[in-house]
Amino acid sequence: LQYVTSLAMATREQEMIRLGISPRGALAVTRMAKAHAYLQERDYVIPEDVQSIFLDVCSHRILLNPRAKVANMAAGDILTQVLKEVKSPDSGR
């Protein structure tokens, strides 16, 4: 849960994003990560579950600023950068 919170906060601090992921968006990420883990036959979520669904869940939930649009940057590109910048917790269980 802390990892999802850190990712959501990072979208609000990213200079190319005008409006980042909301608390409700973070809940959607958490729910989808749980569903992804279930489909992988696990009853727990690992960071890779969050990373696997993050772009799909969040791309339509952010609003890019004009600089990003002028630079022809897509939401997925910026969210990929956010994933790289936020430290992932240890997935060992």
Language-model segments: which ranges?
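C-terminal engagement/docking regions of AAA+ P-loop ATPases
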Residues: 2, 11-93
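Oxyanion-binding "anion nests"
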Residues: 5
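Alpha-helical substrate-binding/gating segment
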Residues: 8
